[in-house]
């Protein structure tokens, strides 16, 4: 089954730590909250520096869509931009984020340990889909997608939720592929 999740319909929700807002792209199981999800994908606009919310037993993957950000962990500092590979880290480890030179838009994937594993990759072109329960494709720019003999048009930040994915996928512009197993 394939569902298009339009960016235009997303509602801004306050962050757990009260320091900003995020827009949920998709969550599993549907309707679950921050305490009950197996996985959750959201997009945030970050304007100010501050600590990331701590999520016990959650693994996170952060991908910058626009802008640059420094992340400070207890043992390292990492700078990311819109060309960086997605960065995975434990959600229960303290992290402090600082936008560099202006606002940042990021994609945040959270997976509950013991229930789900998430893998995020930047993609373009044709590829074999990974063996996963769910695959989510998030358009970075306007993107034409072909999957399961369907041709679909995605606008910026629209997403496809594919349950029990088929063999292959073709995207004609940069996108993010999230495999959830």
Regions found by a protein language model. Give the residues of each.
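Jelly-roll (double-stranded beta-helix
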Residues: 1-181
């Amino acid at each position: 089954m394939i569902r298009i999740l339009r960016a235009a319909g997303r509602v801004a929700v306050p962050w757990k730590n009260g320091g900003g807002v995020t827009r949920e792209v998709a969550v599993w199981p549907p309707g679950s909250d921050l305490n009950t999800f197996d996985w959750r994908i959201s997009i945030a606009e970050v304007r100010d520096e501050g600590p990331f919310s701590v999520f016990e037993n959650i693994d996170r993957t952060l991908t910058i869509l626009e802008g640059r950000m420094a992340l400070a962990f207890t043992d390292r500092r990492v700078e990311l931009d819109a060309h960086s590979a997605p960065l995975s880290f434990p959600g229960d480890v303290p992290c402090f984020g600082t936008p560099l030179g202006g606002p940042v838009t990021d994609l945040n994937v959270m997976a509950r340990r013991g229930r789900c594993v998430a893998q995020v990759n930047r993609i373009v072109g044709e590829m074999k889909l990974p063996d996963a329960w769910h695959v989510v494709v998030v358009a970075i720019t306007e993107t034409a997608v072909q999957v399961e003999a369907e041709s679909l048009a995605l606008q910026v930040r629209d997403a496809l939720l594919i349950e029990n994915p088929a063999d292959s996928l073709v995207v004609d512009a940069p996108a993010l592929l999230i495999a959830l197993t």
